[in-house]
Amino acid sequence: GLLSVLGSVAQHVLPHVVPVIAEHL
């Protein structure tokens, strides 16, 4: 379903987004 698609997208995106956010904090 949609939630499982969003879950899979989050798993691929978060590892890239979190370090970028952390650098700005």
UniProtKB/Swiss-Prot annotation:
Tissue: Expressed by the skin parotoid and/or rostral glands.
Leucine amide sites (modified residues): L25
Main location: secreted
Keyword terms: Amidation, Amphibian defense peptide, Antibiotic, Antimicrobial, Secreted
Biological role: Antibacterial peptide, that adopts an alpha helical conformation which can disrupt bacterial membranes. Each caerin displays a different antimicrobial specificity.
Domain notes: Contains two amphipathic alpha helix regions separated by a region of less-defined helicity and greater flexibility.
Protein name according to UniProt: Caerin-1.3
Source organism (scientific name): Ranoidea caerulea (Green tree frog)
Organism phylogeny: Eukaryota, Metazoa, Chordata, Craniata, Vertebrata
